[in-house]
Swiss-Prot record:
It comes from Sordaria araneosa (Pleurage araneosa). Transmembrane segments: none annotated. It comes from the Eukaryota. GO terms for cellular component: nucleus. The lineage of its organism: Eukaryota, Fungi, Dikarya, Ascomycota, Pezizomycotina. Pathway: Antibiotic biosynthesis. The gene is sdnM. Gene3D superfamilies: Chloramphenicol acetyltransferase-like domain. Keywords: Antibiotic biosynthesis, Nucleus, Transcription, Transcription regulation. GO terms for biological process: antibiotic biosynthetic process. InterPro entries: CAT-like_dom_sf. This is Transcriptional regulator sdnM. Transcriptional regulator; part of the gene cluster that mediates the biosynthesis of sordarin and hypoxysordarin, glycoside antibiotics with a unique tetracyclic diterpene aglycone structure. First, the geranylgeranyl diphosphate synthase sdnC constructs GGDP from farnesyl diphosphate and isopentenyl diphosphate. The diterpene cyclase sdnA then catalyzes the cyclization of GGDP to afford cycloaraneosene. It is found in: Nucleus.
Length: 499
């Protein structure tokens, strides 16, 4: 916990602040996370700070300086200062200078993972081990740190070594989702490269909420595709109880990173597409498209299912869910002016499909290409105007009726949730304008991250079987992370070693 955690009384209200309630969808994500980039380059912290400050001083972007509070009814609201000062900064910025030592001499950070070019690899140590060494000692961490202290939404911490730099951005998920964070990084990079005129217009919480207009005057929303599979009260309690039971008897779980050589993924995808074409000779080859990410979702779910202990019963339902961004659909509906905007808010929804465990593991398992095709079809189905309207309406109705979001499937199902960050091109973010002079003199053309650590606070009860596809490096290696039980990790590692 950071220094902020000690205080429990909220700061007094400043009369000149602009007060705005949080949007419905944003209130669903009351937790914080760190997003750390590791460079094997020396970057200038002041250049980075000045560029970030330039972005946040722009029209609209100053909203990121808002403070978080609860009103008299315990509803969340933003308090946006009229002016920022040293006492009430626009963003938190801290540095940690270790330029007299190499990152290779740091007792923990010298273990930053590097891909194995020959086979898939699960890396040690766990993400939580790196996290505490990549953030500021007094950086906000828990949700209450923002509620009970007069601090802005964004904290940036820079750690400098003689041969490396770590940039950690800490923020609340109530502020925005992954693509909102990527909009900030894009604006930051454009500013560093002197291309501020290309920064997309900002839309934030002071603007009209595009999700509030989703129904577009309809008296009754469309029916959600899985509406008939919503579990009732007892099914929901059963799902929660099974999770708690698993956490109680198997307390050891961790978020860990694993890498897949580019050639391995290429072979996996080529094989999957060939299987799909063979299964559907009536289709044109171009109509049998599945992306690398579709294939990885299906393949990794199979690994998770077959390495559970005790084994999943063949008939047990597996729910494979992809979190997808709705900004394109909102623009299509005219609720956002275009896709080229910096929309700060949460706009991710679920694209799911259900299959028995036997489809992923065992003698009767389906071919990878067919499972990947189900991933693709579920995304195509859910990323429609009708199904976005239906899912959003179901969220709001269930939250008002039960206090929680709806759960679809069965109370004893295995849920595997994926977040695909590939679209953000994280490993292609070039911070070269911030290189110090000695680095530029070496003729370096780019400064790209070699490792990305995206984490939040973990507890014994944190969700399991959740996976992120972090992206593809310049060398072609794929980076992923997943939170699994320790015994499942051990079996997957053994399987990787046999490859």
């Amino acid at each position: 916990m950071g220094l902020f955690s000690a205080k429990r009384e909220p700061p007094p209200v400043v009369p000149t602040d602009t007060i705005t309630p949080l949007r419905f969808v944003d209130e669903l994500y009351p937790f914080a996370f760190d997003f750390s980039l590791v460079f094997r380059d020396v970057l200038d912290p002041e250049v980075l700070r000045a560029a970030a400050d330039s972005v946040l001083q722009r029209d609209g972007w100053r909203q990121l300086g808002a403070r978080l509070r609860r009103d008299q009814n315990s509803k969340l609201e933003y308090h946006l200062p009229t002016h920022f000062s040293k006492e009430r900064p626009l963003f938190l910025f801290t540095t940690d200078n270790h330029t007299d030592m190499s990152i290779n001499d740091h007792p923990v950070l010298r273990h930053v993972p590097e891909p194995n070019p020959d086979r898939p690899t699960v890396h040690q140590p766990a993400a939580a081990t790196f996290r505490r060494h990549m953030r500021g000692p007094n950086s906000p961490e828990a949700f209450d740190d923002w509620l009970y202290n007069d601090i802005p939404q964004l904290a940036i911490h820079i750690i400098s070594f003689s041969d490396a730099t770590i940039i950690t951005v800490t923020l609340l998920h109530t502020l925005t989702d992954f693509l909102g964070l990527m909009a900030f990084y894009k604006a930051w990079l454009l500013t560093l490269h002197g291309r501020q005129d290309e920064i997309a217009p900002y839309i934030g919480y002071l603007d009209a909420d595009p999700l509030e207009g989703l129904q577009q005057g309809q008296a009754k929303p469309p029916k959600y595709v899985f509406a008939d599979r919503e579990v009732g009260r007892w099914g929901y309690l059963k799902f929660v109880f099974r999770h708690m039971w698993d956490c109680y008897w198997h307390p050891e779980a961790s978020l860990r990173f694993f890498t897949l050589p580019g050639k391995f993924v290429e072979n996996l995808s080529t094989s999957a597409r060939a299987e799909l074409i063979a299964a559907h000779p009536e289709r044109k080859p171009e109509d049998c498209f599945v992306s690398d990410s579709d294939v990885l979702c299906a393949w990794w779910t199979g690994l998770m299912v077959r390495n559970q202990s005790p084994a999943c019963p063949p008939a047990q339902s597996v729910c494979l869910t992809n979190r997808f961004d709705s900004r394109d659909v909102l623009a299509k509906m005219g609720l956002l002016p275009s896709t080229n905007i910096s929309f700060f808010g949460n706009a991710a929804y679920n694209a799911s499909f259900f299959a028995p465990a036997s489809a992923f593991a065992g003698p009767e398992k389906e071919k990878l290409g067919l499972l990947a095709n189900q991933v693709r079809d579920s995304i195509k189905l859910h990323r429609t105007v009708e199904q976005l309207q239906a899912q959003d309406a179901a969220f709001r109705e269930s939250k008002a009726r039960t206090g929680h979001l709806p759960l679809y499937g069965e109370g004893d199902m295995m849920m595997c949730v994926f977040t695909n960050c590939y679209r953000g091109r994280l490993y292609q973010m070039d911070f070269s304008p911030a290189l110090v002079d000695k680095e530029k003199s070496k003729g370096k053309k780019q400064a790209l991250p070699v490792f990305i650590n995206c984490t939040g606070m973990e507890s014994r009860w944190s969700a399991r079987n959740a996976t992120a596809i972090l992206g593809k490096s310049e060398n072609g290696d794929w980076w992923m992370s997943s939170r699994l039980r320790q015994d499942v990790w051990e079996r997957i590692e053994a399987e990787f070693e046999r490859m």
